Amino acid sequence: MTESPFDPKFDELPQTLPIFPLSGVLLLPRGRLPLNIFEPRYLAMTRDALAGDRLIGMVQPKPGPDGHKAGDAGARDSGAAEIYPVGCAGRLTAFAETDDGRYLITLTGFCRFQVQEELPLNQGYRRVRVDWSGYAADREMAAPSGLRRDDFESTLAHYFRLYGIQADWATIKEAPDERLITSLAMICPFAPTEKQALLEAPTLADRARVIHTLIEMAVAERGSGDTARH
């Protein structure tokens, strides 16, 4: 994916961001995340983003003291829960209205950020002051991944089979490393803490190692469970 002429310059990024806390939802630089917006506070957030710089920060709420993730029955409201300190800003690149009052939007991941402090609510949605300085490399288009494709694709095939995931292998084999790693990190059913680890991996090479390890662990765990049942 090439840089868009509509993307802001790194040194012109805003000091504050609206945030959308969603557990188990991951956005990475250059990834694309479709969202169905229906709560009044997030409808207001979307309208404000459209009228401004079109940036929205995706963050995950931390698990509650009872171990539930925000949004689960018995868990805290994700709109009030404590959040992880690292998120990813997405630029609103697609927008549609529905007849029943929802917005269908797509965020394209732009750059990660560190949360410095939370600000007062605006129309019910949360805002934070952010620091971008540690993530300038997120805008680099050709970072090396160190991914061993043959080994990785072999493990991935086992993972897809065990989890009943259908895959277009021609597309997978043609995909550049970054696009493949980003897509898998965002769509695979990893736990929220695992998705946060993928987000916080410093470089693409680190993220490649994390996702390969996660898939190997999932194959070993699910595979041993299947063996035990037979």
Sequence positions of predicted segments:
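Core structural elements
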Residues: 172-190
